[in-house]
Amino acid sequence: MTEFNIGKMHMSDNWIEACPAGKVDEEDVIRFDHGGRTFAIYRSPDDGYFATDGLCTHERVHLADGLVMDNVIECPKHNGRFNYKTGEAMGAPVCVNLKTYPVKVEAGKVLVQLG
């Protein structure tokens, strides 16, 4: 697991620098902590970047320790699965969706809008 705690503010609309874009491998997830909260940053097979809350909605385990494949993150504790693009819970044991956040890449940096 890679963990970042950069957290630089960009512009006035709450875009936060999460990590360098090159630090997230294709079909992988990293942890990002900011302001006492934790998030998960994903890179899809088509080179898109996505962000969700970092903890599984079932038992609060960090998703950055999970398995990513085909736009799905699987929780490392009980194998609950979420679509990380939409946050949709994909069956038992998870039944509550993940919160998702807008993401963009500028100047080689992944920015997440938390506001």
PLM feature spans:
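Rieske [2Fe-2S] iron-sulfur-binding domain
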Residues: 24-115
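Zn-dependent metallo-beta-lactamase
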Residues: 2-34
